[in-house]
Amino acid sequence: MEEYLGNEDLLDRYLVAFFASREYSEEIAQRAVQWAEEICQTDKVVISGFHSPLEKEVLRILLEHKHPVVVALGRALYKRVPPNLQQAFDEGRLLFVSFRGYTRHSTKSSEIRNWKAAGIADEVYFTPFNRFSLLSTLHFTYEKYSKTPVHILE
């Protein structure tokens, strides 16, 4: 059961999912920053768990540019909006989506969150990942079986 907190109208806009591996080079980090800055020049809404370090950096850039975001949670909704997200929330540029009612975050809930976020996105972007990453299965499945455009930031 999905639960929402924030501006649900963001779901009616063009959604771009962003997933980043926890392991990345400085070159990949620079490419992700460049991608985030380019996205800020569009009206696309970025959806992600914003959980990995690189995803958090992309979120920081999006918020700095006052760009709308959907924060996908693999756990229950926050009881209070985190301070770093409060302004975006107050300005209607933020939506939290909970795909699981669990109170604790886990690897499995992260995986489910990523699949659900990709499932509602109009386009999906990944940073490079190794073949053992949880992102590998998601990427392979979407690239092979989905009509959703899939990209890897090279």
What are these regions (language model features)?
Residues 1-154:
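Glycine-biased, small-residue-rich flexible motifs in mid-sequence functional cores and linkers
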